[in-house]
């Protein structure tokens, strides 16, 4: 099957769960010490913390699309990064209209 592409299988993409207060965001700046600046889809700019279990599994870079959960205290200023999307998943989110806030 060299040179041929396998038929596309439906992709399963994790979307933000509103009942768990999850929000989509884009990483704007890496601040160091597991901290990032995230532009969220609700229009707020938050400082995000990358938990250790996520930091060890995947690398997060600027312009990555992520899911964040705002803190209960200081919810307009701080959040935790809980998921990072791959390029194919970002394309799917774009086609389905989840990333309208980025335009």
Swiss-Prot record:
Coiled coil: none annotated. Residues 11-86 form the S1-like domain. It comes from the Archaea. It holds the Pfam family eIF-1a. Keywords: Initiation factor, Protein biosynthesis. GO terms for molecular function: RNA binding; translation initiation factor activity. CDD domains: S1_IF1A. InterPro entries: NA-bd_OB-fold, RNA-binding_domain_S1_IF1, TIF_eIF-1A, TIF_eIF-1A_CS. NCBIfam families: eIF-1A, PRK04012.1-3, PRK04012.1-5. Seems to be required for maximal rate of protein biosynthesis. Enhances ribosome dissociation into subunits and stabilizes the binding of the initiator Met-tRNA(I) to 40 S ribosomal subunits. Belongs to the eIF-1A family. This is Translation initiation factor 1A. It comes from Methanococcus maripaludis (strain C5 / ATCC BAA-1333). The lineage of its organism: Archaea, Methanobacteriati, Methanobacteriota, Methanomada group, Methanococci. The gene is eIF1A.
């Amino acid at each position: 099957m060299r040179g041929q592409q396998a038929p596309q299988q439906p992709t399963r993409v994790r979307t933000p769960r509103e009942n768990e207060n999850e929000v989509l965001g884009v990483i704007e700046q890496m601040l160091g010490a597991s901290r990032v600046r995230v532009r969220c889809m609700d229009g707020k700019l938050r400082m995000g913390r990358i938990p250790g279990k996520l930091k060890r599994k995947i690398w997060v870079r600027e312009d990555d699309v992520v899911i964040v959960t705002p803190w209960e205290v200081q919810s307009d200023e701080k959040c935790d990064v809980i998921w990072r999307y791959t390029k194919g998943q970002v394309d799917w989110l774009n086609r389905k209209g989840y990333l309208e806030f980025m335009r």
